[in-house]
């Protein structure tokens, strides 16, 4: 038990007042401003204007601190949503930049801790682990031998103070945390940061990086304790997850010390399952096990109580589904994943007799779902709800080469991401929709017919919808039938895909 306490106490920051002076450095906000302008690769541009004054940001922060320590400090109220100026300046842009500056500054101690941890250790190529596709080879290796999976929707914190309290265990800088708390509570349009959807919350486009940092940090906190208990109860340590845990260390909350000391043995019996695997991406997680339905129900109730008791997050049990892998498909990261039995007939030859032996093996399949994809194309006006291609009038003013390049780029991105699909029939249908939509857009622009345009462009239009691997196959394999058959059976996972943003880049 003493060893558990020591392990949970790792990672406390030893530096005080480290972040607070950086908040007043102009280069921090210049860095945040430049990163906001150039982050369209990962997130959509927040609409920053080039007209930006670092001096105004500094004055705003100084004014906020002055107001914070005054007794009557409410410069603007949360209920007063029409108040948009401080000291005569528009606060929308500068409040965003202050949040971005906070994000840059707060990330510094975590990055330094990571570098100090990696000193003297063999560094892995983490850029490969950043790829979304790196998850699927892991699922292929592990999930084929498992029976049940928990499909979990991770809840958001219901109060800002939960995020601040979690952050203060890592950053021992009371001044900066007080300023952050004051700014969050006094910012008049905080409610616009969280957009409520059907069954979950999502962050709005404004200040995404800062609130993604807070939310991801909160998720890593509960995952650290969760995986710690899992590893302490099993001889099969989670080696594949160890790399990600290097970035975060475990800690012990003061109020939980009695709980861990008193109930540790009672909790660990739930975790004694060696074939247990956990995968998370964004707000969804999968917990798969080789155990029975009863064991998965215990996991479900434990996770709900874990969130409520330790992190004060209310989560309804219906947000966690128990599915059997053999007869249920998982909708995860845009793929429909399932485990199916593959039957093989083997002929065994004896001296005089021969007989057939049937072998059954499990195989992990990944398929591209066609219905959601057609829905996305329909929303973007490339086709109707039935999947019939339409012209794109909004692009008619572009040049012919730009129109063809845009359609071709969308298909190449989709083909690149869904290269892991076992069957390419749905991807070929998407290719047909985009090609015909491109031809109809060009015909609409030149007031001609689709037939004439297809005849005029010929292979020129077709080549724009070739992916890199398709071009290699068509050059190396002369027969079209063998090429299409080879492409149909190929399943490729790439290590350079870090986001899913196929269509929105052009909308």
Swiss-Prot record:
Keywords: Chloroplast, mRNA processing, Plastid, RNA-binding, tRNA processing
Disulfide linkage: none
GO molecular function, one term: RNA binding
Alphabetical list of Pfam families matching this protein: Intron_maturas2, MatK_N
GO biological-process terms attached to the record: mRNA processing; RNA splicing; tRNA processing
Location(s) in or outside the cell: Plastid, Chloroplast
InterPro entries according to UniProt: Domain_X, Maturase_MatK, Maturase_MatK_N
Primary localization: plastid
Cellular component, GO annotation: chloroplast
Position of the signal peptide: none
Family note: Belongs to the intron maturase 2 family. MatK subfamily.
Protein task: Usually encoded in the trnK tRNA gene intron. Probably assists in splicing its own and other chloroplast group II introns.
The protein's name: Maturase K
Gene behind this protein: matK
